[in-house]
Amino acid sequence: MLKHSSAATKENDSPKLKVLDIVSKLEPSLDHSHTHWWKLTSPQLALMLEAADYSIEKQFETLLFHYHWVVPYLGPKPDADGNFKWRSLVSDVGIPLEYSWKWDTATSGPDVRLTIEPINELSGTRVDPLNQAPSLELLHRLAEILPRLDVSWASHFLSTFYDHDKLKYIKESESETGMPLRSTMLVCFEFGRNGITTKTYMSPRKLGQQGFAPLSDYHSAIAALGPSCALDAVTEFLNNSPEGPHLSPFMLAVDNIIPCSSRLKLYFATPRTSYNSIREVLTLGGRLSTVTLESKLRAIHELVKAIMPFPPDLPDDADIPFPEQVLSPTVQDLAESSDMANQRPAFVAGYQYYFDIAPGASLPDIKFYIPIRKAQMNDQAVATGLTNWMRAQGRGAFCNAYTRVLEGLAGGRDLSKCHGLHTHICVMLKGNGEFDVTSYLAPGCK
């Protein structure tokens, strides 16, 4: 059963939740589902904002935004047996929300973000088989209060990634060989110190498709935006690197701002988990190089060792063994299973990367996602490994606050008995040699 910190909503429970107490008192309940999701998520978000040292004003702004713009789009609450009308793939507990904690840098404190799959009563029905209407409605309405919001790129990919005959999607999903209806569109909210911004995530889904879409579907849609040297560099890498055949695309994301300022992030999964594989991808086969690059890559690998079930003396060219209950996936497993939900255990056991290939860039920025194998690593072990690594980088100022966040998400359970609060830890090596580090966190653990 999912555990969460319902106790955090009690009146005068803690001074740090005073902002939440005020918002909860003054804002009326909208309906039973809204009340359910608010009671589950608002104490968690309030705790994260306080732990990240947001100002009181920003805490009010963010919680009010969450109340009016996020919670109403989390969909119908689960029934008495815990079943969801539309089961989102955002988290493996079915809740259509994931938090992220972007760690502090030399010049800024942590940033709190969350990603949702907007859902309503018609999600997965003949009216909206791919569950995209709630996301579109949300973005359209947000344009009225977020003046920088621009959905030009999201609209472009929406028009190219999907077929328009909704009834055929329903009929296909009901056939013996058709792929079940699954999540295809997510919205991320970044609660920055200077304002709220959004991103849209999409996974292509064409009629007749089995599993994740091929790279060609992404390539043609991206190429239609104009020439991209970064895309050309990634394509050349995939065609010529020994790691290329192992990388399978699964998602694309854009910032909802004017295209000339937006990132265009193409996500890949791979079953390969060796150090040599990390090095090959993060250097784009040697195309990216600096004097200190090797030492930085070794530091990233030390983080891998700290939060993964890493065997002693594993050679640089060897993959981390997969858990017994998850057979080592092949690229074909990742790309061709008829149901993306069935791919999840193998999918999250390997590494993930994104390449920022926005037009105008000569080479892509690359971010590396380390999966948390929750069957093998409890959340206390992950937290200890991560915070020790952050302290070793001279960035330990918020480690204790981060642990408090985890304890809140665990709802009072011992972190050593929790598996699944951490979903991924991601790292990007910036041009100045500093690491961007982000923790992705579930809204509870089983």
UniProtKB/Swiss-Prot annotation:
Reported phenotype of the disruption mutant: Impairs the production of the xanthones shamixanthone, emericellin and epishamixanthone; and accumulates variecoxanthone A.
Stored CDD domains: PT-DMATS_CymD
Keywords for the protein's UniProt record, in alphabetical order: Transferase
GO terms for biological process, alphabetical: alkaloid metabolic process; shamixanthone biosynthetic process
Keyword Transferase: yes
A GO molecular-function annotation: prenyltransferase activity
Coiled-coil intervals: none
Pathway(s) where this gene product acts: Secondary metabolite biosynthesis
Entry EC number(s): 2.5.1.-
Residues bound to dimethylallyl diphosphate: 113, 199, 201, 263, 265, 267, 369, 440
The keyword Membrane appears for this protein: no
Enzyme type, top EC level: transferase
Function: Xanthone prenyltransferase involved in the conversion of monodictyphenone to the prenyl xanthones such as emericellin, shamixanthone and epishamixanthone. Monodictyphenone is first converted to variecoxanthone A via a paeciloxanthone intermediate by the consecutive actions of the FAD-dependent monooxygenase mdpD and the xanthone prenyltransferase xptB. Variecoxanthone A is further prenylated to emericellin by xptA before being reduced to shamixanthone and epishamixanthone by the dehydrogenase xptC.
Family membership noted in the UniProt record: Belongs to the tryptophan dimethylallyltransferase family.
NCBIfam families named among the record's database cross-references: arom_pren_DMATS
Name this protein carries in UniProt: Xanthone prenyltransferase A
Originating organism: Emericella nidulans (strain FGSC A4 / ATCC 38163 / CBS 112.46 / NRRL 194 / M139) (Aspergillus nidulans)
Gene name, Swiss-Prot/TrEMBL: xptA
